[in-house]
Amino acid sequence: MSSGGLLLLLGLLTLWEVLTPVSSKDRPDFCELPADTGPCRVGFPSFYYNPDEKKCLEFIYGGCEGSANNFITKEECESTCAA
């Protein structure tokens, strides 16, 4: 294969990798944890990844402890966990 063909193949593979959504095997384990408000009761609107619905949903975070499946924005949740 010529060097031009190899460069084209490399470019296509790179583009495919960038455009491929996060798969469950690439998703961090904490994305499978349930939403957990924690013991505090401040009440911050937050987002968690729901693996059954395969999307990020809003919940109220108490402000301390809880699980790592807790994001300030829906966009952050989706870029980390959503397929």
Curated annotation (Swiss-Prot):
<keyword id="KW-0646">Protease inhibitor</keyword>
<keyword id="KW-0732">Signal</keyword>
<dbReference type="InterPro" id="IPR050098">
    <property type="entry name" value="TFPI/VKTCI-like"/>
</dbReference>
<feature type="site" description="Reactive bond for trypsin">
    <location>
        <begin position="41"/>
        <end position="42"/>
    </location>
</feature>
<comment type="similarity">
    <text>Belongs to the venom Kunitz-type family.</text>
</comment>
<dbReference type="GO" id="GO:0005615">
    <property type="term" value="C:extracellular space"/>
</dbReference>
<protein>
    <recommendedName>
        <fullName>Kunitz-type serine protease inhibitor scutellin-1</fullName>
    </recommendedName>
</protein>
<feature type="disulfide bond">
    <location>
        <begin position="56"/>
        <end position="77"/>
    </location>
</feature>
<dbReference type="Pfam" id="PF00014">
    <property type="entry name" value="Kunitz_BPTI"/>
</dbReference>
<dbReference type="InterPro" id="IPR036880">
    <property type="entry name" value="Kunitz_BPTI_sf"/>
</dbReference>
<comment type="function">
    <text>Serine protease inhibitor.</text>
</comment>
<keyword id="KW-0722">Serine protease inhibitor</keyword>
<dbReference type="InterPro" id="IPR002223">
    <property type="entry name" value="Kunitz_BPTI"/>
</dbReference>
<feature type="disulfide bond">
    <location>
        <begin position="31"/>
        <end position="81"/>
    </location>
</feature>
<dbReference type="GO" id="GO:0004867">
    <property type="term" value="F:serine-type endopeptidase inhibitor activity"/>
</dbReference>
<feature type="disulfide bond">
    <location>
        <begin position="40"/>
        <end position="64"/>
    </location>
</feature>
<keyword id="KW-0964">Secreted</keyword>
<dbReference type="InterPro" id="IPR020901">
    <property type="entry name" value="Prtase_inh_Kunz-CS"/>
</dbReference>
<feature type="signal peptide">
    <location>
        <begin position="1"/>
        <end position="24"/>
    </location>
</feature>
<keyword id="KW-1015">Disulfide bond</keyword>
<feature type="domain" description="BPTI/Kunitz inhibitor">
    <location>
        <begin position="31"/>
        <end position="81"/>
    </location>
</feature>
